[in-house]
């Protein structure tokens, strides 16, 4: 299946591994009122990678995603400082609807679907860009080919579907906007292990089609299994980063729980 990922200009400055990153976060800090939630977070994502961000509750993962998708720019008390770029465009000052236009979209925790609407109508919500509307009919058929179960239930309300099927709808909706980058937030939450395995197999398939993926996940085993690169967050900071082959499970576990000793970085 062709996911129809859009193309774009990359940065002129090489990043990790000497590659030109598609997504860069530099010196990102975030506050909710006086409470600081992120502390100078910096990392880059290369084109075509799956990067997994691991951390316990309260590590700052959700705030990171909110910052990357414009949600920290909505309220009066939440604010961010730093720089977020995708394909040469600044994201840190944009609201959510404008960020989607840059090719970045998200599959949110809890899926956030319209429960009374049909599968087809939920998918079409993702085709809200002018160029996407023109290819919506073709695109939705590609999504159905990718998720055959959705094709069988296209006219049924989402409320009648299982959690795994709803997760498929949420991923399909993200694909409808022709993304170059998809941010996945806690895909395993509330799902049976066998269903999660199927969902992550689909994430890898999406990635192989050319879509760059950033995966937020508490389940360390699954995050490592899908990732080309791993970031571990603790108390609003990135405390460990590297490829699964570079990092030992002991190091990752220690970083996750805050007991990692200095690695000499």
Regions from the PLM with identified roles:
Residues 79-89, 136-140:
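Conserved ABC transporter NBD signature motif
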